[in-house]
């Protein structure tokens, strides 16, 4: 999650955000793991950046999480629609960009049927072991306006 106080603490005078102190206490574990999974319980909906109750974190936060070694993002959660369908779509766009440049993967939400089929379940192979990851949520605080982008629900 990314609360208002965290956003303010990370803000720099030039308008950027720096999260370099995040995860320092667990970095040695991240560095020595083959698979690091993060529950991304916020959107990357763009400005204005907000905390509770409708989360929208700076894009730099997702980049920092990736740089720390997280390589799987779980995206289905009650906050994924905090900025409605447009915010969720922008979040997926950022995750796709990270997936192309940094070999991260995500599951739990999808922009279309093809993406849904590729990520649900998310199948990964690490050291010759095949791993299936399924991510779903009980619901969202603000429902999606249409069938796509799709959210995996527990009832599905």
Could you describe each region identified by the protein language model?
Residues 1-156:
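Acidic, metal/ion-coordinating pockets
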């Amino acid at each position: 999650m990314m609360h208002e106080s965290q956003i303010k603490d990370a803000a720099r005078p030039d308008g950027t955000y720096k999260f370099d102190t995040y995860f320092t206490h667990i970095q040695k574990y991240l560095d020595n793991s083959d698979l690091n999974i993060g529950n991304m319980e916020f959107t990357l909906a763009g400005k204005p950046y907000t905390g509770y109750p409708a989360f929208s974190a700076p894009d730099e936060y997702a980049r920092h999480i990736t740089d720390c070694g997280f390589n799987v993002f779980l995206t289905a959660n009650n906050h994924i629609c905090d900025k409605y369908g447009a915010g969720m779509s922008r979040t997926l766009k950022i995750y796709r960009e990270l997936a192309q440049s940094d070999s991260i993967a995500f599951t739990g939400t999808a922009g279309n049927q093809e993406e849904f089929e590729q990520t649900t379940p998310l199948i990964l192979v690490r050291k010759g072991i095949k791993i299936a990851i399924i991510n779903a949520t009980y619901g969202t605080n603000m429902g999606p306006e249409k069938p796509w982008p799709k959210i995996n629900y527990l009832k599905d």
